[in-house]
Structures are given as structure tokens and as C-alpha cells.
UniProtKB/Swiss-Prot annotation:
Keywords: Phosphoprotein. CDD domains: p23_NUDCD3_like. PROSITE patterns: CS. GO terms for biological process: cilium assembly; protein localization to pericentriolar material. InterPro entries: CS_dom, HSP20-like_chaperone, NudC_fam, NudC_N_dom, p23_NUDCD3. Residues 120-143 are annotated as: Disordered. This is NudC domain-containing protein 3. Residues 187-279 form the CS domain. Residues 128-143 have a biased composition (Basic and acidic residues). Pfam families: CS, Nudc_N. The keyword Glycosyltransferase does not apply. The keyword Phosphoprotein applies. GO terms for cellular component: cytoplasmic dynein complex.
Length: 363
């Protein structure tokens, strides 16, 4: 699928929503489509059935999808709450720092002031306030020197932050990645988050809040590379770029924009194996600590039928009831039991009369 084609889905769905006018009727349209055009509402009552879902499975699937996005919404609420609290805290710190800056009469550059609030104000602010002398007793040279010392301290912190070993702000342990659905079986990196299942990968590249339309971003995918950029007036600003650690299927890979949040890129794996990293040079994750269970969504129809039959047989065996191979033979025998000319016609059919080996039945 060509980059940008995923936006067609948003436009189509938005058109439906605008036409019906409310979410309830919008959901009716979606589930009506599933009812008319798919086997979503068809019950899988027998292991030999090749279409439909076991009783309760379709409802559980809908609930699972709902819970997934409900969890994401709760995370968004928590994130907005933390951002608001952080803004309030910064404003309070700026208000406290303003009188001291006016007393010293030193113009502190804005970037330095921001770093000072984050790194130095919490640690040394109270002690410096206690040691301040009355304005009349301060020497001008001392005042200027004092201001330069304060300007250099944040720079030291900034240079330390730019070193090869950043502070442990991002989680580094796989157990922490597993707790976040966006980094499940993946990792959180400086400029993107990725997760994976048996057949696909999902990469989230954060964008500024003003990025609301697909034309404001540029995504280029090849079998071995990825590039995500933000379109600006003077060109493009690259958000993520590099060589993939494995090949992808570009025809079934796609991307979309979550307005004001991130570019969501779905990569389709060429082979069914677990990735330890998205980009070459990226710190690999510990494959032994991820969940390697294969999702039922990745199982094809034939494999799904076998799994359903084995599950059915297991529960039947626990309850002492006939298994699928026995039921199939019983059904065949029952048809001929009362047939014209049968010596058993008129007698009650008793399945217990027959001992049927599983190998005697071909599914």
C-alpha cells in the first residue's frame, strides 16, 4: 500500500459518521456490515464448520478491542494531567525565581533559565536565597560574577545530559516495556516507540501538537529502510530514519497520522520471527524476556480449525462426552440406522455400542 493510502479509511469513516450524525448509528453501520458481509455473527457449532465464531467469541473480541483503546484513552488522560501539573509547577518556579533575578539585575538567557529551573533551582535555589545580601551591600563586580556562575552551572548540566550516557529517564528493562501496550514486545527509544507480534511491527513516532494533517508529514518505506519526517516551510525535519534490521513487506505495510500525537507505522514482517531492534545500531532488546506466544489473529483458517477441534475434544474428554471423531462417525451411523432395510430400524441408537479410534476418521 502506498504511503498516505491509510488516510482514505479515515475519510471514508468520517464521511459515514457525518452522514449518520452520531456514534450510536455509526456503530450500527459497522456491525451491520459485519452481519451482512462477514461470518462475524455466525456461530461455530461443530468442529467441521469452517466459518463463524464459537459462542461468545465474537463478543469477547469486540470487548477486547474496546478495552485496548479504553486503556490508551486512560493513558492519554493521565499524560494530560501530568503535563498540566508540570506546567503549573514550572510557572510557580518561574514566579519564585523572578524576584531573585530582578535583585541581581542580571539578564539570564531564556534557554539557560529553563535549564536552571529543571536542574538547579530545586537543588540549590533555597540555599542561594538564604545567602542573598541586601541590594545596597552588594558589590557590582560581585553581582556580575555571581550571575555568570549561575549561568555556567546549567550549561554544565546540559553538557552532561548530552554525553553518551543519558540520565535513566527512558525505561531500559524489558519488564518495563512489557507494561506499556505501545512498547509490548518492543522498546521505548528517544524518538520513537515500537512493539511487535508474530507477524507485524508497530512504530509510533511522536509529532508536535500542531501536526494535524497527513500532508504535514512524509513517510518513506522500502523493504530495508524507513524514513519519517515532518514537512516544514524550509524543507523537511527528519524524525526517524535508518536501515531496518530485517526485511519488510512494503505492499502490506502502511502508516497513518494520529493528529497531534504521532505517526503510526505498521510494518509487515517478511518472515515469522521476533525482532530484537527496529533500526541497525539500536540497542537490542532481550528476546528471551518478551511474550513469544503466538496470537490467534495470526493463525490461518486451516490451523484455526485444527485448534478449535483440539480444544473441543479436550473439553469433551474432560466431561466424558464423545469427541469430534466419534461424533462424526455417530452422525454417519445414525443416518443408516433407520434407513430402509436396516436391521436396526425402529431401535434406539446407542453410541456406546461403538468404539471408534481417532485414526479411523479423516477430517
Amino acid at each position: 500500500m502506498e504511503p498516505g493510502a491509510a488516510e482514505l479509511y479515515d475519510q471514508a469513516l468520517l464521511g459515514i459518521l457525518q452522514h449518520v450524525g452520531n456514534v450510536q448509528d455509526f456503530l450500527r453501520v459497522l456491525f451491520g456490515f459485519l452481519y451482512r458481509k462477514t461470518d462475524f455473527y455466525r456461530l461455530l457449532r461443530h468442529p467441521s464448520d469452517r466459518m463463524g465464531f464459537p459462542p461468545g467469541a465474537a463478543q469477547a473480541l469486540v470487548l477486547q478491542v474496546f478495552k485496548t483503546f479504553d486503556h490508551m484513552a486512560r493513558q492519554d488522560d493521565e499524560k494530560r494531567k501530568k503535563e498540566l501539573e508540570e506546567k503549573i509547577r514550572k510557572k510557580e518556579e518561574e514566579a519564585k525565581a523572578l524576584p531573585a533575578a530582578e535583585t541581581e539585575k542580571v539578564a539570564v538567557p531564556v534557554p539557560v533559565q529553563e535549564v536552571e529551573i529543571d536542574a538547579a533551582a530545586d537543588l540549590s535555589g533555597p540555599q542561594e536565597v538564604e545567602k542573598e545580601e541586601p541590594p545596597g551591600s552588594q558589590d557590582p563586580e560581585h553581582t556580575v560574577t555571581h550571575g555568570l556562575e549561575k549561568a555556567e552551572a546549567p550549561g554544565t548540566v546540559s553538557s552532561a545530559a548530552e554525553g553518551p550516557k543519558d540520565p535513566p529517564v527512558l525505561p531500559r528493562i524489558q519488564e518495563q516495556f512489557q507494561k506499556n501496550p505501545d512498547s509490548y514486545n518492543g522498546a521505548i527509544r528517544e524518538n520513537y516507540i515500537w512493539s511487535q507480534d508474530y507477524t507485524d511491527l508497530e512504530v509510533r513516532v511522536p509529532v508536535p501538537k500542531h501536526v494535524m494533517k497527513g500532508k504535514q508529514v512524509s513517510v518513506a518505506l522500502s523493504s530495508g529502510t524507513i524514513r519519517v519526517a515532518m514537512v516544514e516551510e524550509n524543507g523537511e525535519r527528519v524524525l526517524m530514519e535508518g536501515k531496518l534490521t530485517h526485511k519488510i513487506n512494503t505492499e502490506s505495510s502502511l502508516w497513518s497520522l494520529e493528529p497531534g500525537r504521532c505517526v503510526l507505522v505498521n510494518l509487515s514482517k517478511v518472515g515469522e520471527y521476533w525482532w530484537s531492534a527496529i533500526l541497525e545500531g539500536e540497542e537490542p532488546i532481550d528476546i528471551d524476556k518478551i511474550n513469544k506466544e503466538r496470537s490467534m489473529a495470526t493463525v490461518d483458517e486451516e490451523e484455526q480449525a485444527v485448534l478449535d477441534r483440539l480444544t473441543f475434544d479436550y473439553h469433551q474428554k474432560l466431561q466424558g462426552k464423545p469427541q469430534s471423531h466419534e461424533l462424526k462417525v455417530h452422525e454417519m451411523l445414525k443416518k443408516g440406522w433407520d434407513a430402509e432395510g436396516s436391521p436396526f430400524r425402529g431401535q434406539r441408537f446407542d453410541p456406546a455400542m461403538f468404539n471408534i479410534s481417532p485414526g479411523a476418521v479423516q477430517f
